[in-house]
Amino acid sequence: MIAPAPITLEGSGVRLEPLTLAHHDGVAAAAADGRLWELWFTSVANPEDTRGYIAEAVEGQRAGHMLPWAVRELATGSIVGSTRYHDISPQVDRLEIGYTWYAATWQRSHVNTACKLLLLTHAFETLGCRVVGFRTDNFNFASQRAIEALGARKDGVIRHHQARRDGTVRDSVMYSILAGEWPEVQRHLATRLARHADETH
């Protein structure tokens, strides 16, 4: 596996731009669409904490265990969310996709499918990952449904796993896609995007 480096990924109406402080206002505005920070089981920062949120992500990138992006929707030119590679482990050819959130206006749109197709294609076909993982809070049922809709398989639940922002400790629901499963998942995601395109024209 090649160690991930900052890169712009674009396709299906979205562009993933390496996250920097230049995205501050766009990220803050996207989080404000739906007041996403009020969902206690998410990783979305209060707009007042956006600078620290971005700085933490960039520091993770420098340390080599994280690669964050801002998500830009191309038809509007707006920043509509953020996502990351994290827990990057070249020793076992594995990384995870997470810290993903979208402005309320863009939830249940083509954006998540388009982003996941870009991220998974890059992970499997460019970086050479053997497995891509996902994790989510046991109470974040929308996230669990979204991950399962991608075609990821549920590996299990790690109990008492991670601290939430409010100080409580969550159970983490773990999912993964293996390299051998990627061609089928890729076809599935491409079909979903084609169906969305047909419905919007």
Task: Mark where each language-model region is.
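GNAT-family acyltransferases
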Residues: 1-111, 122, 126, 168-201
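Short secondary-structure boundary/hinge segments and terminal tails
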Residues: 48-49, 141-142, 164-166
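Conserved GNAT acetyl-CoA-binding A-motif
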Residues: 125-135
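Conserved beta-strand-loop-alpha-helix junction that forms the acyl-donor binding cleft
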Residues: 134-144
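Conserved catalytic-core motifs of GNAT/GCN5-like acyltransferases
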Residues: 135, 153-167
